Amino acid sequence: MNIFFLDKDPKIAAQMQCDKHVVKMILETAQMLSTAARAQGHDIGYKSAYPNHPMTLWVNKSPHNYAWAIIHAFELCEEYTKRYNKIHKTKKIIRDLYEICNGDYAKMTDPPKCMPDEYKTDDYVQSYRNYYEGDKKRFARYTNRGTPEFMQ
């Protein structure tokens, strides 16, 4: 479980993810959003999963964090369609989860840095970029999308 904060803008962060993560992180993010929604009393989305994971706790911490994550999940779905010319089946669940969103993603709190200490800096975006370049570059491919500058 993780969210890769490769940019402060949830759309750009989705566009910067490699093919493997565009596919995988849609489901993981929907699971975190579903867990947060269920913790707030909503019976929607997937069953709760990893409720005590630092990133799931962050998503549930404020409506603004939830808003960032839901927009990011939607943008990952858009990225999936751009790269593979298909619609990810989780997109419907993400739309349902969006219905309870009442936050402003610009007011989100700093997310946890779920990565080895060697990649961490004071800036969470730089930390996630360090982690991505240092640990994910070996398998990173970008179908129908240019490689982000920090990965070159």
Regions found by a protein language model. Give the residues of each.
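Sequence termini and other peripheral, non-core segments
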Residues: 1-52, 56-152
